[in-house]
Amino acid sequence: MSARTLFDKVWDLHTISVLPSGQTQLFIGLHLIHEVTSPQAFAMLKERGLRVMYPERTVATVDHIVPTENQQRPFQDSLAEEMMQALEVNTKAHNIRFHPIGSGNQGIVHVIAPEQGLTQPGMTIACGDSHTSTHGAFGAIAFGIGTSQVRDVLAAQSLSLNKLKVRKIEVNGDLAPGVYAKDVILHIIRKLGVKGGVGYAYEYAGSTFVAMNMEERMTVCNMSIEGGARCGYINPDEVTFAYLKGREFAPQGEDWDKAVQWWRSIASEPDAVYDDVVSFRAEDIEPTVTWGITPGQGIGISEPVPTLDSLNPDDQAIASEAYKYMQFQPGQPLKGTKVDVCFIGSCTNGRLSDLEEAAKVAKGHQVAAGVKAFVVPGSEQVKQQAEAAGLDQIFQAAGFEWREAGCSMCLAMNPDKLQGDQLSASSSNRNFKGRQGSASGRTLLMSPAMVAAAAITGQVADVREVLG
């Protein structure tokens, strides 16, 4: 047998059958659910008189609609309260593990599963959420799915899928100070495009990823979907194993040793054949900020907003639309642009190390006058850990609001929203029109440290200059 990639190995191990259509019926090892995409799926089960096939392989939490300030029940938003109640009823009826607000384990679904040790190498993972690719950081194959597919996994613990091609994305070298995992993935998406990964799984490889901690790797894999890929992964290694060891749902004792041995075996082989290979140099990546209305419209902080004639013809129409919506002029510097709101959080950048890096920037400074800045931990565990380290005090002393765990201003499904055409510096993953709650609200994606730099200067800034 020829040398294989991790993707091929995990896919083959989870193949139930090849269907007449050519699709694969793929077993799903872990199903994560939340309040937004699960109610309709449970209703479909009820209509057909079906039960959840493997409730022990399903884990639920509430994240999208959660208020990050007043969490008193019933929620002020009646639709949010309805979704919350539906999740409570459905998980109880089907004996599904549920992490509610105040449990100590609630949070964004893509934050809580890794921190509890639920996400492990070699798994297939599905969730009714675009950013399920996050879990690929562990060497898992993880897909975001739609509501009808949520129903299928609940009922049959499997999905009918077309097998993906595999593109190896190599990044080698050391990242300069002030350059983070978020900058790496924004750079990759900028270069390959938001449609560049369609039909692919992305394998991230090279010394730059090897040097990253697990939370940084999760940031990279999280935004694979923004680059058009269905999933993205990094081969498991000693960093992966060290992160998982001792976590609640990780194997223990002899089972741990056996698991690590197996996890090593599923990594892509050195001479594995890929459908495509793309290489980047870490030294070419600087703090990166989006200027437009797609995650692919990014530039280094030292660059101006691109002019129309500098872009590929295929990118010019969306660029023209972006100039108008974002109120930017071609050729203008992004650095120095005044910001209104600064948001640190999300499933991309709401983990402890993200908050630590932002706190280094904020410490000893004050949020600029007229800027609203707030920090939303990705989970109750992250919040507790951050408070134990005194990060909440650093942020609050600098004038940031310190909130409860949730998805918050990443999307407009809770009270945290932009007003009018406010400009947001955000550590989240999407900068689409209206994404943060206002039909004319504008979003600049950047690393948490860059958001902190924007908050204290009141404008888009180079974090390297703030850090000195």
Swiss-Prot record:
GO terms for molecular function: 3-isopropylmalate dehydratase activity; 4 iron, 4 sulfur cluster binding; metal ion binding. GO terms for biological process: L-leucine biosynthetic process. Pathway: Amino-acid biosynthesis; L-leucine biosynthesis; L-leucine from 3-methyl-2-oxobutanoate: step 2/4. Its EC number is 4.2.1.33. It catalyses: (2R,3S)-3-isopropylmalate = (2S)-2-isopropylmalate. [4Fe-4S] cluster binds at residues 347, 407, 410. It holds the Pfam family Aconitase. Binds 1 [4Fe-4S] cluster per subunit. Keywords: 4Fe-4S, Amino-acid biosynthesis, Branched-chain amino acid biosynthesis, Iron, Iron-sulfur, Leucine biosynthesis, Lyase, Metal-binding. Its cofactor is [4Fe-4S] cluster. Belongs to the aconitase/IPM isomerase family. LeuC type 1 subfamily. HAMAP family: LeuC_type1 (MF_01026). Catalyzes the isomerization between 2-isopropylmalate and 3-isopropylmalate, via the formation of 2-isopropylmaleate. Heterodimer of LeuC and LeuD. PANTHER family: 3-ISOPROPYLMALATE DEHYDRATASE, HOMOACONITASE, MITOCHONDRIAL-RELATED. This is 3-isopropylmalate dehydratase large subunit. It comes from Synechocystis sp. (strain ATCC 27184 / PCC 6803 / Kazusa). The gene is leuC.
